[in-house]
């Protein structure tokens, strides 16, 4: 699976003595052989600074046609560092050690070469990967398949590995899963690979436990405690969940997801298992489904419809069963050891102080064993504060003083290696095992083919002809390594690769190889060809120097071919300490000397520090030289000022002489410049014929090409115009098609609108008929109700009319009685001729005679309400034919008048409307209805309701006679004015009434209002 590049940069140091393999690197195979040649000492593996990945190539087999097998002396084996045993022998070399060719690998100091026959170990033909920047590439690299190159890269990705292993474990059958758990649990009781046979009988190793694992007593106690909790407090669901948690622990341990910055893997895996168990739990399924059904969120039909979509594992129909006792014991042991490891890591993290931060990034290889070393220090009870040095080793405060530390002992390193090995992922452990086996195989094979020989020098190599190139060390200094190399062209010719014929080298002076120091491409390595030596007389064809190194440090120098990227050899050397007191004081040496090669990053850092120290030293010297130069310049300036002063202080003659000399010098220089310009002009005027011919040829070519260009431009313009015309025609067709489409769309829209309008009109017509029918039905009901109301009102009005007629008859009877009384009084007055008063007739009166008074006047009513002689007469019953004055017209009061209508026909149009005379001042105003009374309606109401309290009807005879003499008077006015209106016993709301009346003078009155209105205003 793909892995992130971030984890590849965190690869651990490949040190065999600490027991850790390259967890983030994968073995790359060469095309010639499938065997691997890997050195776990950290020096032979050359890593890149940019991609941080290493190719661990294989060695060539004996059947490889490139390597000739004629003689043992002519066979060259690529050097490789020795195992951990070789590190112990490293200090035996004074100025360094080298492991290179099986026959010849030299380390020379001051011209003396020493053979390293016992330290020689290595396969043939190794290869390192170049750095991404600044590396030399050959055309042969283009044939490398990118897929094959990508397949050789294995990056560390603990989270993906852990989840993949967990998924794989959950899919295994129960029997296979039990076997896996048994194997995993048995690993906790096995001794570490670094433990010796005597450690099995050591009480400390058994009961205290090796580094990274608890002791045996602690494991037994934790297993018993967890087993007690398992049997007493955990129910079936919890036991099954804990059983899957054991699978999670196995996956985390094998995938390496529980270490470093991958703490979130534990939570993710536990969450996945917990969610699976919660979803598959029958009780939780019943609770959730019952809650959803009771709250009507889903229906049973919907549940039965979609229930088949769920996997069969989630549709549990019966409760879970308890796991077997064997699986329970294995799960208890695995979980107990996981809890113990977490507790130990937490305690170690809390009690151990953090290493000091220098503000710079620490080498990933150097910091690989930091946590393991801290845990080892915690387990051993060491109270010395420590931190990780630049070379990846623990450096304490006492190390600066003594240079030695107890944590670097063999037992401490063994525990440290055991803990690192226990934290490696499963695939890293497999890779480490394979690498170790292949390395031992290559080492034993190389030793079997290698024969020891006597020390040799460069003079001993004269006249030797080897089939392949050879590189050896000539001198080792504190900051430089000098080397020499043989001729590589013969090797290319013998191999038949054809690299020189293809032009890979380009020239004889091109470097046939380049240098990598500790896996990093070394830019300060210089290689030059030896030209003075005759060919064939000496083996030295190339000499080089590796500069920029730090003193007292171990380096692994790899020499790689430029054309094939194949390693020629790998030599491990150690630079001596610097004896210069001044440089020692300026350059800070490592706090603890390292006898193994550092990582590329550490190597570059040390080189940078050394270069900076030298630069600072040169700067100080330059600063000192600048100060000295400033002093010298100041002295010279003083002398120059003195000479100038002496010159200016001279006489005028000397000054004029110097001026004339200066002018002569200027004239001579000007003449020389003029002559030179004249010569150039002469040369320019005479143009050579050859140049003129060339110019004419070039001009003809230019004109020809210009003509071709113009014709091409014309063709291009014509083609463009034709294409433009075609495009314009196509655009016109497109626009017309778009217009037709728009017209069709508008027509379609219009037709759709008409169709919708017709459909809506049809629907609306049906609704309109229904609405009209409903309105007609409602109107008929309202008319029926109104008709019933009018019928009731007509019945009430008819009853009221009958009551009015009865009362009118009574009033007419009273009027008849009054008329009879008046007639009797008139008769008495006629019989008595005396004056009306004792004093006689009043002035202005016209006493009437009996002859002047007609008989018909005796029957007229008096206009006044005053009674004769102050007497009031009771009402008399009149004849049924006598009627009152009608408001419609005036009629005679004589009972025998033939034109007078009967009394039962004379009633007003409205029962509450009547005309009032001038005698009643209380009824001159027209009032409103009772439903909307004004300020005067209270007066009207009181008089109207108090009609029975009016004064008795009285007549004044004199006034009656005076009115009779006045022309146009109405004989029935007094009677009409003396009548009180009769109130209606009912009120009718919402109706209108009107009335009119007339008297003898032609006056009329009208009124309008509600049925409660009783009077009309007279004009």
Swiss-Prot record:
Keywords: Coiled coil, Membrane, Transmembrane, Transmembrane helix, Ubl conjugation pathway. Residues 44-66 have a biased composition (Low complexity). Its main location: membrane. Residues 602-788 form a coiled coil. Residues 992-1008 have a biased composition (Gly residues). It is a multi-pass membrane protein. Residues 30-43, 68-83, 131-143, 580-589 have a biased composition (Polar residues). Residues 1-94, 109-143, 343-371, 580-603, 831-855, 879-905, 963-1019 are annotated as: Disordered. One of its GO terms (cellular component) is membrane. The chain crosses the membrane at residues 163-183, 216-236, 259-279. It is found in: Membrane. Component of the regulatory network controlling carbon source utilization through ubiquitination and deubiquitination involving creA, creB, creC, creD and acrB. Involved in resistance to acriflavine, and required for normal growth on a range of sole carbon sources, including fructose, cellobiose, raffinose, and starch, and reduced utilization of amino acids, including GABA and beta-alanine, as sole carbon and nitrogen sources. Belongs to the acrB family. This is Probable ubiquitination network signaling protein acrB. The gene is acrB.
């Amino acid at each position: 699976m793909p892995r992130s590049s971030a984890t590849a940069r965190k690869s651990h140091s490949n040190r065999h003595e600490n027991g850790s393999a390259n967890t983030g690197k994968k073995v790359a195979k060469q095309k010639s052989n499938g065997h691997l040649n890997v050195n776990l000492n950290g020096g032979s593996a050359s890593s890149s600074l940019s991609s941080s990945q290493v190719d661990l190539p294989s060695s060539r087999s004996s059947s490889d046609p490139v390597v000739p097998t004629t003689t043992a002396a002519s066979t060259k084996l690529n050097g490789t560092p020795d195992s951990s045993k070789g590190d112990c022998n490293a200090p035996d070399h004074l100025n360094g050690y080298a492991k290179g060719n099986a026959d010849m690998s030299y380390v020379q100091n001051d011209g003396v070469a020493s053979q390293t026959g016992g330290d020689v170990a290595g396969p043939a033909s190794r290869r390192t990967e170049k750095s991404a920047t600044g590396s030399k590439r050959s055309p042969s690299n283009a044939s490398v398949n990118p897929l094959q190159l990508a397949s050789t890269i294995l990056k560390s990705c603990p989270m993906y590995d852990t989840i993949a292993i967990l998924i794989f474990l959950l899919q295994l059958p129960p029997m296979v899963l039990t076997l896996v758990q048994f194997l995993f649990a048995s690993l906790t009781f096995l001794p570490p690979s670094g433990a010796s046979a005597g450690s099995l009988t050591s009480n400390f190793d058994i009961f205290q436990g090796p580094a990274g694992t608890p002791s045996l007593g602690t494991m037994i106690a934790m297993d018993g405690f967890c087993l007690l909790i398992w049997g007493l407090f955990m129910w079936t669901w919890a036991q099954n969940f804990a059983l899957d948690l054991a699978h999670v622990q196995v996956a985390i341990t094998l995938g390496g997801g529980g270490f470093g910055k991958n703490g979130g893997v534990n939570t993710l895996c536990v969450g996945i298992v917990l969610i699976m168990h919660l979803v598959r739990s029958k009780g939780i399924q019943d609770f959730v489904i019952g809650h959803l059904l009771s709250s009507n969120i889903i229906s049973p039909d919907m549940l039965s419809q979609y229930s088949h979509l769920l996997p069969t594992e989630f549709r549990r129909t019966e409760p879970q069963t308890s796991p077997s006792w064997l699986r329970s014991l294995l799960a208890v042991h695995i979980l107990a050891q996981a809890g113990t490891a977490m507790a130990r890591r937490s305690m170690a993290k809390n009690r151990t102080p953090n290493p000091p931060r220098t503000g710079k990034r620490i080498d990933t290889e150097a910091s690989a064993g930091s946590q393991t070393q801290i845990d080892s220090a915690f387990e051993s009870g060491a109270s010395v504060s420590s931190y990780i040095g630049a070379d990846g080793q623990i450096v304490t405060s006492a190390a600066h003083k003594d240079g030695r530390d107890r944590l670097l002992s063999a037992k401490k390193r063994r525990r440290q290696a055991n803990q690192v090995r226990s934290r490696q992922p499963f695939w890293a452990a497999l890779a480490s095992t394979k690498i170790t086996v292949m390395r031992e195989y290559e080492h034993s094979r190389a030793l079997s083919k290698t024969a020891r020989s006597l020390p040799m020098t460069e003079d001993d190599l004269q006249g030797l002809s080897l089939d392949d190139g050879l590189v050896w060390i000539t001198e080792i200094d504190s900051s430089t390594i000098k080397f020499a190399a043989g001729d590589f062209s013969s090797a290319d010719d013998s191999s038949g690769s054809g690299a020189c014929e293809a032009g890979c080298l380009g020239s004889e002076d091109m470097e046939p190889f380049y240098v990598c120091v500790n896996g990093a491409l070394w830019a300060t390595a210089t290689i030059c060809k030896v030209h003075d030596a005759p060919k064939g007389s000496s083996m030295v064809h190339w000499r080089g120097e590796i500069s920029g190194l730090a003193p007292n440090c171990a380096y692994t120098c790899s020499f790689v071919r430029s054309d094939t990227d194949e390693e020629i050899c790998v030599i491990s050397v150690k630079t001596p300490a610097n004896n210069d007191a001044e440089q020692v004081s300026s350059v800070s040496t490592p706090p603890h000397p390292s006898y193994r090669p550092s990582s590329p990053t550490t190597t570059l850092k040390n080189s940078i520090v050394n270069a900076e120290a030298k630069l600072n030293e040169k700067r100080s010297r330059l600063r000192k030289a600048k100060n000295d130069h400033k002093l010298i310049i100041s002295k010279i300036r003083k002398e120059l000022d003195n000479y100038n002063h002496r010159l200016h202080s001279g006489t005028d003659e000397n000054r004029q002489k110097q001026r004339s000399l200066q002018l002569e010098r200027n004239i001579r220089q000007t003449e020389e410049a003029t002559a030179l310009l004249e010569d150039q002009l002469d040369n320019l005027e005479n143009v050579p014929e050859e140049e003129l011919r060339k110019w004419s040829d070039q001009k003809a070519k230019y004109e020809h090409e210009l003509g071709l260009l113009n014709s091409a431009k014309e063709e291009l313009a014509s083609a463009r115009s034709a294409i433009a015309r075609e495009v314009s025609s196509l655009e016109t067709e497109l626009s017309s098609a778009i217009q037709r489409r728009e017209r069709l769309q508008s027509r379609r829209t219009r037709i759709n609108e008409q169709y919708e309008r017709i459909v809506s009109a049809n629907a609306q017509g049906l609704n309109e008929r229904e609405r009209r029918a409903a309105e007609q039905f409602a109107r008929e009901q309202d008319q029926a109700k109104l008709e019933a109301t009018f019928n009731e009102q007509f019945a009430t009005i008819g009853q009221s009319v009958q009551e009015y007629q009865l009362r009118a008859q009574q009033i007419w009877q009273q009027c008849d009685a009054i008329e009879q009384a008046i007639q009797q009084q008139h008769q008495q007055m006629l019989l008595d001729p005396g004056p009306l008063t004792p004093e006689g007739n009043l002035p202005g009166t016209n006493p009437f005679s009996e002859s002047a008074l007609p008989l018909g006047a005796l029957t007229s009513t008096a206009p006044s309400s005053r009674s004769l002689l102050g007497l009031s007469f009771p009402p008399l019953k009149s004849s049924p034919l006598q009627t009152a004055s009608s408001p419609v017209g005036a009629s005679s009061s004589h009972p025998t008048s033939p034109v007078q209508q009967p009394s039962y026909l004379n009633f007003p149009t409205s029962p509450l409307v009547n005309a009032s005379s001038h005698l009643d001042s209380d009824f001159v105003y027209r009032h409103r209805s009772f439903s909307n009374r004004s300020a005067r309606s209270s007066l009207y109401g009181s008089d109207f309701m108090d009609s029975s309290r009016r004064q008795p009807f009285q007549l004044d005879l004199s006034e009656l006679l005076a009115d009779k003499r006045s022309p146009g008077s109405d004989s029935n006015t007094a009677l009409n004015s003396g009548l009180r209106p009769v109130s209606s016993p009912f009120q009718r709301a919402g109706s209108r009434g009107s009335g009119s009346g007339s008297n003898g003078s032609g006056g009329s009155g009208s009124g309008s209002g509600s049925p409660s209105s009783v009077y009309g205003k007279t004009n």
